[in-house]
Amino acid sequence: MKFPASVLASVFLFVAETMAALYLSSTYRSAGDRMWQALTLFFSLMPCTLVQLTLLFVHRDLSRDRPLVLLMHLLQLGPLYRCCEVFCIYCQSDQNEEPYVSITKKRQMPKDGLSEEVEKEVGQSEGKLFTHRSAFSRASVIQAFLGSAPQLTLQLYITVLEQNITTGRFIMVLSLLSIVYGALRCNILAIKIKYDEYEVKVKPLAYVCIFLWRSFEIATRVIVLVLFTSVLKIWVVVVILVNFFSFFLYPWILFWNSGSPFPENIEKALTRVGTTIVLGFLTLLYAGINMFCWSAVQLKIDNPELISKSQNWYRLLIYYMMRFVENSVLLLLWFFFKTDIYMYVCAPLLILQLLIGYCTSILFMLVFYQFFHPCKKLFSSSVSESFSACLRCVCWSSARRKSTEPVGRIDTDLKACTDQGAQPSTSKLTPEATEIWTAVDLCST
């Protein structure tokens, strides 16, 4: 049975980040900074509450008689209790006989164009561990993008304003680790959801590549937002609201345009109001993820599983192009409106470093999809093929514009030859004209 390392990592980041935030809020209270204290506590306690609700919802404990579990979640200690429960199940799994065994069927990755279906016995303990891993993965994503991301942005903004790095703020680098880990779990969840019928095995190099990709992407995004906020405090509200509502409303707009009925089968115990609340929370999380990085999971409300399983390279390309343009514009505005606190900062060099950092994240993303994606054999087209097709399209369009004038000369020669009753000779034409004449000849046949 696989060691529950992901559960341990999720609980460690949850506890460490919460303790660091509480310590930092106490330092703000001692210094008399009530506003910073309130915001730090809010971005710490709000995701804690959402994590407790997520664990209760996934395990369906609200409809079961488990008062101790409910009490631990009310005390914000639910993840610790669940972690102890996970390791108890793991340690006792080899000692007790499984009273119930289910059989799952998974297809292996294709080899030489063939894919075999493999049956696997899953015991009761392994099934419970799978549920715990799934719950903690979702909790890590919620904690990362609804708590850690705004918390890291806030603390970095305070550091820039006060030009002082305290011990508490340095400890908040845990927030960056939490965001990167949440994005990594989001990638793994997306792969397992899209390729649910296959046996997916993620190699260590794939984890390293995703970690580097997400680290560069999220770090540069947070720094860009902080720099822009430090000089244009009012306009950053506009930027955040436009980003948030664009991604929040996008799944709903697609749902309304599809004309599909309202989804009723998300959870049998939920009413229509409860389903609406769950969908609203999912779109809120979807918008929060896309605010800082690319969401590997694409929300699709008209789908019974709420997740789109198609691999849309064009949506990925458009997202990173628009995000790169947005980051560049925000950095240029910061450069023109920067204040005296950046007197000793080489602004052009900083802008160049941030843009190179974002391009580095895109490079690691392309490397992951090209070489380390566990299901790359199932892609209809690889990253390199899509990139080559895009380059060919650009080159073809530019060549077509350049060959407009030779085409005119060809038409004149053809008309003259036709009037004389002679066959045109391609040897007198330029190479470009010869290619075009061949294409015309083929099309006419």
UniProtKB/Swiss-Prot annotation:
Keywords: Amino-acid transport, Disulfide bond, Endoplasmic reticulum, Membrane, Phosphoprotein, Transmembrane, Transmembrane helix, Transport. Residues 24-37, 90-140, 192-207, 256-276, 338-348 are extracellular. Signal peptide: none annotated. GO terms for biological process: amino acid transport; intracellular calcium ion homeostasis; intracellular magnesium ion homeostasis; myelination; regulation of axon diameter; regulation of cell size; skeletal muscle fiber development. Its main location: endoplasmic reticulum. GO terms for cellular component: endoplasmic reticulum membrane; plasma membrane. It comes from the Eukaryota. Residues 1-2, 59-68, 162-170, 229-234, 298-316, 370-445 are cytoplasmic. It is found in: Endoplasmic reticulum membrane. The modification Phosphoserine is found at S115. Pfam families: XK-related. Belongs to the XK family. This is Endoplasmic reticulum membrane adapter protein XK.
